[in-house]
From Swiss-Prot:
Signal sequence, start to end: none
Organism in which the protein naturally occurs: Pyrobaculum aerophilum (strain ATCC 51768 / DSM 7523 / JCM 9630 / CIP 104966 / NBRC 100827 / IM2)
Protein name according to UniProt: GTP cyclohydrolase III
Disulphide-bridged cysteine pairs: none
EC number: 3.5.4.29
Length: 221
């Protein structure tokens, strides 16, 4: 069973509107600070976070105790201009766990499965066509992956550059996701008890594929 924690900045819209029309630079600065804290504190307990709309974020918290999650949220509260709250959900897939957030929680057990993907020859494509071209290419790829994830129960997120992170229900799911991806990609898949350890293993697998100049999937357990 997988566990997802959803983090919400309560009253965030009202706070932004209170700043007046000359506010966007303030909003972006605050969002950057919260995003930095999110990654710093959640990964310190072995969880794997990512922002959604900035007023909402989530974290894969399989095998992480609720008390530890609460401690992290308390740290984020200290730098947030508004209150911060969270809920947890457990499910057979990361998507189902997200959808169950706020329901009666169960125990998460088993392993975390995370993929770290990049696009082959994206640097050459950037040099030829510019960064905006590659950025849009990645966005279209994530959209394609999201469509496949609806049935598989995975969640996909853009990490920057040409990097995509996927929270998977199992190792086999990555091969099903890639059936619809038209680009040549390298993917590291990590399997571990704690989510961030799984991501580290996924990155190790991706680095191996890069060094070897290979295309496809490398699973690291």
């Amino acid at each position: 069973m997988h566990k997802i924690t959803l983090i919400r900045l309560r009253g965030y819209r009202e706070w932004t509107e209170s700043l007046g029309p000359r506010r966007e630079h303030i909003i972006q600065t605050v969002q950057a600070k919260i995003h930095s804290a999110l990654w710093k504190y959640f990964t310190s307990i072995g969880a794997l976070p990512h922002h959604l709309r900035y007023d909402f974020s989530l974290a894969l918290t399989t095998n992480i105790e609720t008390g530890r999650v609460g401690e992290v949220v308390a740290k984020i509260k200290r730098i947030s201009p508004v209150d911060v709250e969270f809920c947890e959900g457990v499910g057979r897939t990361p998507r189902e766990a997200y959808e169950n957030c706020g329901a009666t929680p169960g125990e998460s057990a088993g392993v975390s499965v995370v993929a770290h993907m990049d696009v082959v020859d994206s640097t050459a494509a950037t040099n030829k066509n510019g960064p905006l071209y590659v950025y849009r290419l990645i966005q279209r790829t994530i959209s394609t992956i999201d469509s496949g994830c609806e049935n598989l129960g995975c969640l996909a997120f853009y990490l920057g550059g040409d990097n995509i992170m996927l929270l998977l229900p199992n190792v086999d799911a990555i091969y099903q996701v890639l059936r619809d991806v038209e680009l040549s990609v390298r993917v590291g898949v990590g399997v571990a008890k704690k989510p961030y350890n799984a991501f580290v293993k996924a990155t190790r697998g991706l680095d191996y594929m890069r060094v070897k100049g290979r295309v496809g999937v490398k699973v690291v357990k």
